[in-house]
Amino acid sequence: ACALTDPFARAESAKTPTADSHQQRSRLSHDAASRTRWNTSWDDRDETTDVTRIIWLVRHGQATEEKRGEDDGTRRLTNLGRAQAEATARRLGELLRGRRVHKMTHSTMARAEETANIIARFAFPSVRRESSHLLREGAPPRPEPDTWRQSEETHAEDAPRLESAFRSVFHRASTSEDRDRATASEERDRERHDIVVCHANVIRYFVLRALQLPPDAWLRLGLYNASVTRVEIRPDGGVSVRCLGDAGHLSPDQLTHN
């Protein structure tokens, strides 16, 4: 006589992962080639400090559409872009209430400068300001997969500039900054806060470089206009991204990408 069996039970058991299959998948996803090693001396600084740097990366608000033959650096904020920047200013003011912002640096492109002006006006009227051409929008190293398809000349020109921008912004606090903080009685928690207002490609590249992840993955990340990214650099050289492209302060009808 033939034994009666449930075909659905056989199919279900075939789908059920076993301990061996879990181990095999673990080996495939955590093999030596896929692992990274953290370089604690990534910023070439060996000074002793107890100050944690907190960098607030802000993408500019929505800008006017890009037109063929027009200088990309002259594009200004739309009315919506200005409203986005104001909302971001108020959000940063809430997050940094009671803390001193050491400096706000912005790209020399009009849309980033205008965003920084709004942030200063509504939240940090006395903050020290700087502008940097290194922070202008550009083409980081060629992305993988390469769906952007910029010319090799564009990447060759922009990638070194963006790397210079990263090195100028991302590093541990110096001992002189530590001493400055020791005299600032209003400061709390041994933190130094810096705001950087720039562009999507720049921020995406910065985040991957700061985390020592493959920078060619930058195009896989997406950032809303006027979004906020928070990166912490600890005295031991450790780096953490506490939020990436946060746009919770914007209403749904204010969410844009361009």
Predicted regions and their residues:
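Phosphate-handling substructures
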Residues: 64-65, 70-76, 118-185, 189
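Alpha-helix N-cap/helix-start capping motif
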Residues: 109-113, 200-201, 225
